[in-house]
Amino acid sequence: MNKIKLGFAVCGSFCTFSKIKEEIKKLSKSDIYDIYPIFSEYAYSTDTRFCKSSDFVSEIEEICKRKSIKSIKEAEPIGPKKMLDILAVAPCTGNTLSKLSAGITDTSVTMAVKAHLRNGRPVVIGVSTNYALGTSASNIGCLLSRKNIYFVPMRQDDCIGKPRSLVCDFSKIGETLNFALKNEQIQPIFI
């Protein structure tokens, strides 16, 4: 049986990287997916208090057993070559949400999404932004209405300290992928 070709795009919500690494490990061990790692330019090159970028990238590439896509030039062939069956963007930052909503293609991740969507194939978004219920709310609403866009269930992660913040339930990425491959949105979206 052929494995499902999964693009896994990582944006710069650095505090979630340890959770993302665990989910990529689970998906890799499931033996269902052949995973293509994709990094935003910031996720690929920015060292933070959470991790050194080169270490994180190396770990993900080792799990996926392939080099990452990390530039617009490298992401563009995803469409014409029909490289992927499904594409996940997790964590998806507010900045990336706004660009996807507006059709701006100026990063490796936004190019990967644009190139993939041209083939009418599913994109799964795992939100992680402090402004989801503020400036990013309209972008989430816009993307919810778009064909072939699906969301990982999300919740307020700190309703007192960060009342506008939403983070997806990363443990539901696999389940969301299964639904999206059937052109269905997992429910509920807000948990």
Where are these predicted regions, by residue range?
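A cross-family phosphate/adenosyl-ligand binding-site feature
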Residues: M1-V123, S128-I191
